[in-house]
Curated annotation (Swiss-Prot):
Function: NDH-1 shuttles electrons from NADH, via FMN and iron-sulfur (Fe-S) centers, to quinones in the respiratory chain. The immediate electron acceptor for the enzyme in this species is believed to be ubiquinone. Couples the redox reaction to proton translocation (for every two electrons transferred, four hydrogen ions are translocated across the cytoplasmic membrane), and thus conserves the redox energy in a proton gradient.
EC number: 7.1.1.-
UniProt keyword Transferase, yes or no: no
Name of the gene: nuoI1
Protein name according to UniProt: NADH-quinone oxidoreductase subunit I 1
Organism: Rhodopseudomonas palustris (strain BisA53)
C-alpha cells in the first residue's frame, strides 16, 4: 500500500484529537511523590537542639560523585562538629548513600525536589542552609548519649542508658 502513508498519519492524529491531554499544570497541580522519594538533603538536630553531625566524614566517603565537603572541629566539651559542611547540589545525584552512611541520622533526604537556580554557585549549600530546626525522620535519638565516647564532665559509662566499659583482663581465667 504505497502512497497511503499520509492517510495513516492522518488517522493517528485523528485518534489523539479527542483524548484528554496528558500535560500537568505543574505549579498549580503538584505531582504525586512516593513516600520514599529522595530529594533535598537536610542536616537535623538532636532533641536538645544541638547539631547531630559529628563530622565523621563517612557521608563524603560514601558519596559516589564527591559533592560533600566538610571539616571537623572539636568543641570545648570534646564533642566533634563540622566546622563547615557543604553540599554541591549541581553534582548531587540524590542516591541516598550519604543518608545510609551517617551513623548519627544527621543527614536526611526530604521529598523536596525544587532546587532550580539561575546560577550554579547558588546550588552550593552551606551548613546554615542545610540545618533544620527539627529532628527529621528519626525522633528522640541522641548520639552522644549512646556513642561510648567520653566527653567533658562524663567518663565512659556515665551517660544515660550506657553501661560501664568491660574490663577485658578481669574476664581472663
Amino acid at each position: 500500500m504505497k502512497g497511503f502513508g499520509w492517510l495513516e498519519g492522518l488517522l493517528r492524529v485523528g485518534r489523539k484529537l479527542f483524548v484528554k491531554a496528558e500535560t500537568v499544570q505543574y505549579p498549580e497541580v503538584r505531582p504525586y511523590l512516593p513516600p520514599r522519594s529522595r530529594g533535598r538533603i537536610v542536616l537535623t538536630r538532636d532533641p536538645d537542639g544541638q547539631e547531630r553531625c559529628v563530622a565523621c566524614n563517612l557521608c563524603a566517603v560514601a558519596c559516589p560523585v564527591g559533592c560533600i565537603d566538610l571539616a571537623k572541629a572539636v568543641a570545648e566539651d570534646g564533642r566533634w562538629y563540622p566546622e563547615h559542611f557543604r553540599i554541591n547540589f549541581a553534582r548531587c545525584i540524590f542516591c541516598g548513600y550519604c543518608e545510609e552512611a551517617c551513623p548519627t541520622a544527621a543527614i536526611q533526604l526530604t521529598p523536596d525536589f525544587e532546587l532550580s537556580e539561575w546560577r550554579r554557585d547558588a546550588l552550593v549549600y552551606d551548613k546554615h542552609d542545610l540545618l533544620i530546626a527539627g529532628e527529621g525522620k528519626v525522633r528522640g535519638y541522641r548520639y552522644w548519649s549512646v556513642a561510648g565516647k567520653a566527653i567533658q564532665g562524663k567518663d565512659k559509662g556515665e551517660a544515660d542508658h550506657e553501661a560501664p566499659p568491660v574490663d577485658l583482663k578481669g574476664l581472663l581465667p
